[in-house]
Amino acid sequence: MSGRALLGQIGLRDLVTLYCRGIDRRDFALVRSCYHDDAIDDHGGMFTGSADEYVAWVAEALKGMECTIPSIGNSLFAVDGDRAEGEHYSYNYHRTRPPERQELVIHGRYLDRYERRNGVWKFSYRRIVFDHGTMNPVDEAGFAIAGADAPHGSDTRDDP
């Protein structure tokens, strides 16, 4: 692998991680900055549209969640000059707001296309493939015990 391709993979991994951070912290300006202006996001039957439309949609969709943890597992990148493709296995945890909190866990894959323009990698196309999902009530007693003495995360930029 060439040094340029390796640097491309590092930049792409950072891009995917920044996207997850933006979703987790509800930093939708950060999420939007991960996409080229002409990019398309296809969220598996729930949404397909432009980057601006996606950011508006996901911001609204996450209002009902008190916690969102997007995680990326195995990742593969194929870099070809200023274009690349990526496949990422994802594990996404969502917890709805009280009073009847639910835990939604989604396993899937992101199938991405990227372009490097003006030296910057961004999504040109992002598609999610749904592999598995579960939704269960939150175990409130267990939740209270497990997090009793630990700092609690936040869906804002003030997260510890």
Which positions does each model-derived feature cover?
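Beta-strand elements of well-folded, non-transmembrane domains
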Residues: 92-96, 114-116
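A solvent-exposed, acidic/Ser-Thr-rich amphipathic alpha-helical stretch
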Residues: 28-92
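Short beta-strand edge/turn micro-motifs at domain boundaries
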Residues: 85, 107-140
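Short, P/G- and charge-enriched loop/turn segments at secondary-structure junctions
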Residues: 62-64, 98-101
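Short, low-complexity N-terminal intrinsically disordered segments enriched in polar/charged residues
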Residues: 1-37
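Binding-site signature for planar aromatic cofactors or substrates
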Residues: 9-13, 56, 82, 94, ...
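Acidic/histidine-enriched, glycine/proline-rich intrinsically disordered or flexible terminal extensions
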Residues: 134-160
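Outer-membrane beta-barrel transmembrane domain signature
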Residues: 103-105
